[in-house]
Amino acid sequence: MTISKLIYNYFYPRKKRGFVGFLPLFLCHFAFEQVQAEVAPVYVDDQFELPSGFHIYKLAENNATGGSYDIIFDGQGRILVGDTTSVRRLEDKDEDGIYESYKVIATGLGGRGPQGLLVYGDNLYAVGGDGVQLYSGYESGDALKHQGRLGARFNTGGDHAAHTLLRGFDGYVYLVTGDGGGVKDRTHITEETSPVLFERAASVFRFDQSGTRWECVSTGSRNPPSLGMNYLGEFFSMDSDM
């Protein structure tokens, strides 16, 4: 006798069987068929140079990600993408490792953006529109409330404009912008203690969570498209043409 038959006999003794007893088996069989019908991941290993033992598969199709100018994880491991004008939270409802749907949680971020995203506590910071935008209510799971722009205006959406946001080990939010981001003199610097006194071309800024205190920590580059940080808090970037 099979395990499934033993379980069936336990929950549905012979004297109580009938149509009701037959239904759970039908539902279980249907669920099994659904699992069998799931689409297998599409591997694209041949399009990349990978270390031995590593694989890459397509996590989501374009209908879920949109234009996808940026991608991050929030503190719970959920995926956010910028879809050219808004922020989408991708959803894997059947938990098969493929994200087939999404929910728009923030809007009004202009064209070709957002190109910088960061979830920090209950807030979402996004680079789009006229600069760094603050949205609140992230932990509610619903659409977020736009609190407005933080700091002075930045140009966004361009290759040489404002880009990546990072959370530093010191609790500050870090932003990198290219030489087309609108940096000049002390346009964005608010603090006398700023390590860099004047903004010049591409720069890295840091600001507090409220977005009221701004400092410049690096300047003089050309067009860094992104910004990385290692476990020591050191920053890394590159020029887009070098």
Describe the residue ranges of each PLM region.
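Alpha-helical transmembrane segments
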Residues: R17-F22, L117
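Sec/Tat signal peptide C-region and signal peptidase I cleavage site
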Residues: F32-Q36
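N-terminal secretory signal peptides that target proteins for export/translocation
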Residues: M1-K16
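Bacterial N-terminal signal peptides
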Residues: G21-A31
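N-terminal targeting/docking segments
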Residues: P13-R14, G21, E191, F198
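Beta-propeller domains with acidic blade repeats across secreted/periplasmic ectodomains
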Residues: A37-M242
